[in-house]
């Protein structure tokens, strides 16, 4: 086809087709006798003259019978070639002259819509496979893959194969999650494909750390203790936009605030040298202890619910396992001997589990910061925040960056990132007037409901929607990202009423993204206070 020329084949009656070529930029209005009236991008008078035919009078082109009805595909091919590129093709001219012809208006009235829909379904079924196979030049992996998966499952279309390693990482992630979704709809085993997608995401995030391996060195005297403390955080707007993979291809905007409880940072870590070449882990609030004497014991960090998953993964990232270490050692015992001591790490989380205040991520950041000081690694707060994101990938809990940066960076702020695997946020500090002024300070209440959920369960379903380019998920996330800027503006202006209403809007967005956010027990609490509050929300991924 020449550039700018399109072809439409319209079903007419029970067995015939109308051949309808046209120009992409044709206005399809104007008299046939007017030189400015275009057909396939050229004056229709010129088109008719080139083909030795005469078109009648001053009739508008919209009403002109130009489109022949054909009985076979062979006729369609011949007449279309004559109409578009081969004006001297006599057999095409004969078909056009002898056929019954319809105008554009006639086609609108006489098209067989049932056949048209069926025809489009057949084409669509074939096109899905072609789009997937031609992914290098097609938009397949940019489409709403959750919708595409429904079509693949319904029509039993053969799944696209797993993409080889030379393809872009994000495209391979989309590929595995798409395959997983089709299998899930068909009732087949899908978890393996799903886990491959999550594993590739971890690979992309962890690869940045593998390039800069660590050499921990004892940085304290034997009678010294490193003491790390952090507040927790409350997210006010934009939560979820910080979560991979969404933030990797769209960036994220989050407004949150660091808070202490009862005047104290509730998350604390103590590290001191040990006389034995072992790593001793203790948790004050859980009353647990574990002694680690091998790399395999240290690598056992990806069990959700383990009391010491976080310090184990943090020690791994600090270079206490071979894959993250700049030096080679025969064993952990030998490494600790070269280090100069063992380590005793004590954790205290003076806050209920599953509170939604970012406890696990901020505790991880606090542990990483304390280890950095103890081992002379000199990580700044940006590096600690980034390594916390990676640590959570190692734990397979996933999660974004707003929790750790919300706690490690003081006060009230807007955090923003751009797309890409480097998710170090730009920080825009906000005035704390609405939180500290005597007129507004008593208007804030942090209330513990006693209802908990593991963020991993919530994350996995929403992240699955992100991987699949789900229009429902991505649309809400885009609104959340814009809403964070509205919240930033309201706080900047010291507008308490608008700020309160925007907190309420954040809650509505969270419910739209995750219907399980508002169980009956939470709704019962809300029903008692909603008439007296400008806004309310559960913090985090459901509180």
Language-model-detected regions and their locations in the chain:
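C-terminal nucleotide
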Residues: 6-11, 16-18, 32-337, 386-397, ...
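Short, charged, amphipathic alpha-helices and their helix-cap/turn boundaries
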Residues: 337-345, 383-384
């Amino acid at each position: 086809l020449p550039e700018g020329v399109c072809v439409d084949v319209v079903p007419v009656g029970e067995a015939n087709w109308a051949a309808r070529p046209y120009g992409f930029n044709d206005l399809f209005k104007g008299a046939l006798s007017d030189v400015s009236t275009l057909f396939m991008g050229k004056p229709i008078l010129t088109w008719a003259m080139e083909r030795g035919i005469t078109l009648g009078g001053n009739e508008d082109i919209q009403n002109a019978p130009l489109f022949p009805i054909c009985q076979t595909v062979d006729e369609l091919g011949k007449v279309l070639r004559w109409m578009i590129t081969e004006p001297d093709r006599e057999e095409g001219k004969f078909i056009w002259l002898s056929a019954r012809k319809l105008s554009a208006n006639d086609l609108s009235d006489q098209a067989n819509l049932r056949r048209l829909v069926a025809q489009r379904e057949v084409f669509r079924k074939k096109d899905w496979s072609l789009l997937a196979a031609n992914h290098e030049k097609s938009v397949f992996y940019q489409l709403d893959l959750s919708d595409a998966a429904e079509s693949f499952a319904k029509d039993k279309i053969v799944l696209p194969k797993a993409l080889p390693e030379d393809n872009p990482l994000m495209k391979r992630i989309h590929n595995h999650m798409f395959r997983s979704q089709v299998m899930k709809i068909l009732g087949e085993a899908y978890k393996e494909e799903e886990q491959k997608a999550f594993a590739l995401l971890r690979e992309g995030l962890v690869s940045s750390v593998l390039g800069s391996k660590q050499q921990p060195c004892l940085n304290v005297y034997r009678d010294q203790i490193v003491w790390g403390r952090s507040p927790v955080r409350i997210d006010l707007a934009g939560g979820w936009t910080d979560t991979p993979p969404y933030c990797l291809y769209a960036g994220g905007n989050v407004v949150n605030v660091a808070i202490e409880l009862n005047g104290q940072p509730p998350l604390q870590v103590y590290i001191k040298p040990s006389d034995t070449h072992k790593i001793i882990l203790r948790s004050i609030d859980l009353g647990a202890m574990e002694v680690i004497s091998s790399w395999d014991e240290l690598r056992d960090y990806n069990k959700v619910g383990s009391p010491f998953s976080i310090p184990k993964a943090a020690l791994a990232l600090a270079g206490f396992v071979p894959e993250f270490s700049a030096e080679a050692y025969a064993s952990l015992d030998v490494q600790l001997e070269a280090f100069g001591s063992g380590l005793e790490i004590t954790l205290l989380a003076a806050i209920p589990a599953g509170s939604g205040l970012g406890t696990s991520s901020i505790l991880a950041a606090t542990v990483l910061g304390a280890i950095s000081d103890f081992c002379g690694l000199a990580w700044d707060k940006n590096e600690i925040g980034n390594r916390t994101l990676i640590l959570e990938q190692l734990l397979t809990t996933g999660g974004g960056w707003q929790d750790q940066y919300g706690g490690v960076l003081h006060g009230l702020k807007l955090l923003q990132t751009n797309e890409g695997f480097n998710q170090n946020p730009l920080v825009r500090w906000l005035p704390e007037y609405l939180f500290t002024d005597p007129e507004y300070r008593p208007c804030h209440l942090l209330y513990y409901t006693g209802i908990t959920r593991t963020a991993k369960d919530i994350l996995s379903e929403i992240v699955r929607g992100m991987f699949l380019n789900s229009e429902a998920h991505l649309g809400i996330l885009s609104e959340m990202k814009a809403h964070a800027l509205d919240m930033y503006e309201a706080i900047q202006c010291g507008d308490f009423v608008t700020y309160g209403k925007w907190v309420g809007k954040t809650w509505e967005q969270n419910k739209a993204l995750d219907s399980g956010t508002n169980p009956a027990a939470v709704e019962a609490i809300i029903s008692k206070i909603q008439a007296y509050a400008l806004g309310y929300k559960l913090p985090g991924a459901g509180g």
